[in-house]
Amino acid sequence: MANGKFYQTDFVSRGGKVSSSEHGAWMWNKLFDQDFDQTLTDANLKPCEGNKAVLIATSSGWTNYRHQADILAYYQELKKNGFTDDDLILIMADDLAYDSKNPYPGQIIRNNKSLENLYSDVKIDYKLDQISPLDLKNILLGKSNEKLSVVLDSDDSDNVLLLWSGHGAPGTLLWDENQKTITGDFMSDLFNEMYAAGKYRKLFGIIEACYAGSVAAKCKGVPNLLLMTAANDKETSKAELYAPLWNTYLSNSFTMAMLETLQGENYYDLSIRDLYSDTFSKTMGSHVTLYNMESFGNVFFNYVFEYFCKF
């Protein structure tokens, strides 16, 4: 119910079924679609000379299959777009491929029709239980040590893409099954430190987690940072594509929508505003939200290829 009216939405149920009407979903979504200031200007930045990506799945276990599967889908998409493993840092639990419940041992499949193996030729830099949130901070700040041999090798001429998939709670992102949490203040401080250290030209973070907006909202004012979340600060994000053979969900609604948009469009014509709008309209059960545009620039004239395609 909103503005005194009831709206019925398409929703992916926990059993994998879709109910209700597309028109109802559209009516509901229209109430919450963001408007963007078309007069915003970008900071006077040096030309982009390269780009890097950090991909993190912050859960483990078979019931959380979707988080690692989604991160691997992003990983394979970036590899297709010219990224090498030297350009990528991949962090995940890596406990799915040989799980006894896996119907395709040695593989991670997110599309139960094409059966594409997302685990093929994957280079995992850190397993989730090997590092802590403090280690993650050092990785993103480029501070290597005996434990952390792979860190973000970027400077203020590089665009950085951060892809994150896991669980969240109000005000926090959960880190591994020990329920360690990463707060909005932690992320804000980290991004500010990265900017001060010259670790990025622009940073685009895409976060799939419940209540992710409550963390992103704390990052307001960080220079040249843009965050897109699967859910706003008051709601959960939704699993999607339940597969009986796997007895779990293979993906999340937001990431399904995001990758469908990315794989169906020309990256060089797709603005971040277009990416937001299309992903928003396809994501059921939560509201995709952008944060910190005022400190980032004009989303109508910043393009997806600047982050997802290798320079």
Model-derived features with residue positions:
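Cysteine endopeptidase catalytic domains of the caspase/legumain-like
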Residues: M1-F311
